[in-house]
Structure formats: structure tokens, C-alpha cells
Amino acid sequence: MNPNDRQRNDRFPQSPARRRLFTAAAAVTGSLAAWPTLTLAGAAGPGTNRLVLVILRGGLDGLGAAPAIGDPDFAAARGPLGQFAAPPLRVDPTFALHPSLVELHAMVGQREAAIVHAVGLPYRERSHFDAQQVLESGGTRPYELSTGWLGRALVASGSKGLALNTTVPLVLRGHADVDTWAPSVLPDPSADLVARLERMYAGDPALATALERARQLRADSPMATQDAAPAGMAASGPRPGAFVTLSRRAAEFLAQANGPQAAVLEIGGWDTHANQTNPNGPLAAGLRQLDLGLAALRAGLAADGAWQRTAVVVVSEFGREVAVNGTLGTDHGTGGVAFLLGGAVQGGRVVADWPGLAKGQRYEGRDLRITTDLRAVLKGVLGDHLKIASRSLDAEVFPDSAKVRPLQLLRG
């Protein structure tokens, strides 16, 4: 608990009945609240570029997602991990995409997606917690920074951010104007409960205003009608995964004229120590959900023309070892892969200073060697897309990074 919250609770002790009523009030705001359609300070205006960051937590196997099938050492280095249930989706003579990434492959073909391979952080150890802290903070060592690079970037651009989560992730922390949104697990409040809250809040202008705003936002939400539809009236077909649902909602928020300029989504489950060779195993299933979510994001933004002004960056905290382990999975590594997509991306290509897969070419004889600093990718996107000055990128967004030159990955 936040110490300030503890002080407030101690100062205003609550009876059980009062606690229940405040719990009910939380249910109202949780189930009513949605992204505002009115103009907000810091909100992006019509025609403003949008940025989406997708964090794959757990350490994506870059050679599984984007296999280097043309590398002469690929088959021997990967063993059973180099065999796929369906042919990999070839991108160029050296690289392909996992057969689960059908939509992403189509975007590469349409020159709306690019693959950055052998990419990674300055951090070279294999701890999830430390690597994710470096990934999100933008530092070179774990815990040297307590705010996030995207939060600092939004301060520099004066823009609003959104986390599709119940809390603000480290990458967005700082002094930026950031909201959060996540699907409510609570039922919609009854009319009687809302009426009781209105009476209780009548003497408190701030609470009364907040309740009315939540009700209005719920009514204005792009998906309010769909959310309220009975189960029997929902679209046919299997229930979409959580990432697909969040991607659709993110697209709606970003497409609004006064929506956020940047949004962050997360997917867990990429720590694939076992069962990677299974066509329905964790890697293949995760990539399918990622692929469907990215397609949903594109479809939602394309409808209003916002896709042409959007850049999506997909990253993970580290890659995995090149060789298979004893449980047909992979262990923590270093070098990995990042994906860029969107109408603003100069796609149709693989960006890689390829180090090779022979044992002597690997980092510590185990991992894909990092030849591209992930900060170069991020600095290129932030500079070209959000128009953040080089001096801010070098000193504030990614401190002491002047030697890391930005990659030009977006359309001119």
C-alpha cells in the first residue's frame, strides 16, 4: 500500500457498511469509466503521429519468431527447434517468420513492417527482472533510473500516454500525463446503486463531478454498446484472446481525434523453457495471439486513416539461447528480435548486422550476439515520429547515449 493511502485510510476510518459502499463506488467507476472523448490537456490532435509499444515479457526466442533459415549453420545450431509444422514464411534469402505470423508477414510484403534482428540491450545478463527494468527505464544498468524512457519522451513532446493495464508500467512512469485502462472484471452497477451514490455524493462537488463524468464517459465509450450486449448477441466465433481485445480497444482510443499519442500493451508467457517444438505449444500459441492482436490494431486504426500515422514497436527484454535445451525449449539468452510496423514504417525489409550462428560466433558460445543496440531503434522512432530533439534523446530520454546513433526506420 502507498504510505499516503495508509495515512488517508487512518485519518478517515470506515465502518463495514461504509467500506462496502466505497467498494460499490469503485465498481461504478471501474465499470463505467472509459477513455474520454472530450479534449484533454496533453491529448494528441487530429493528424498527430501515434506510437504503440508492445512489450513481450519473458524473453522472446528471436530465432523462433524470425528464423535465419538461410544461415548455413541454422539447421545444426537449432536442431529440432529449426523444424516447423508448416513452412516458415520467407522474407528474404536469409530470414523468415514463424508460420504463426501470417498477418505480420503480409504487412512485411506490403512494406508496412520491418524486422530488426540481433538486437538487444546494453544489459548482457539473463535476469528477467533486471532486463525488464533496463528495457523500460532506458538505462544501461538495472535500477539506475526510476522512471521510464517513454514517460520522459512524452514529457519532452508534451503528449498524453495510455497504458492498457491496471497500473502504469515503468516505461511510462515519470511526469507524463498517463492514463490506464483495463477491462473491468466487475458487473455493471445497478441503477439503484448509482442513485444511492448520487445522493451520497450530492454534498461533495468533486465526487459528484467524478461520478457524472464516469457515467458520461461510459455512454461515450466506442465499445459501450458492444460491452453491454447480451452474450447471445455477440459475434460468432471463438472468444478472442486478451491481447486481441486490448489491441482493438487501443486502436479505438488512438483513433479518437483527442486520444493519446502513445499507448503501451503487454503480453506475458514468452519464457519458453519447454515444449517449443509443439505446433500448439507456448511459442506458437503466443505468436498466433500476437499476430492476431497486431492485425486487430491495424484494422482499427486503418478505418479512420490513423494507421498511416502510426508506428508500432514490439520488443522483449532479451532473446534466448541458440540451442535447444533438454525439455525442447530454450533458456535465457541475450540477442533477440524486434518488430516495427505501421503506415509510418519503411517496411518490407530485415535490418540486421548478422553475426552468424556458428558456436564461435555466438555470445559466450551460447546466444545470438547483439550487433544492434535497441536504443538505436527507439531513438530513431522517437526522433522521426514524435519529433523529439536529438539532445533530449541523448541526455534525458536515454541518458548518456550520444554514441548510440538512431536508426532511420520510418518513412521520410
Predicted regions, residues:
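Feature for exported/extracytoplasmic and membrane-associated proteins, marking the mature portion
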Residues: 2-51, 55-304, 323, 337-340, ...
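Conserved H-loop
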Residues: 307
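Histidine-centered active-site microenvironments of extracellular/periplasmic hydrolases
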Residues: 316-349
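Short, conserved beta-strand edge motifs with alternating hydrophobic and charged residues
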Residues: 263-266, 311-315
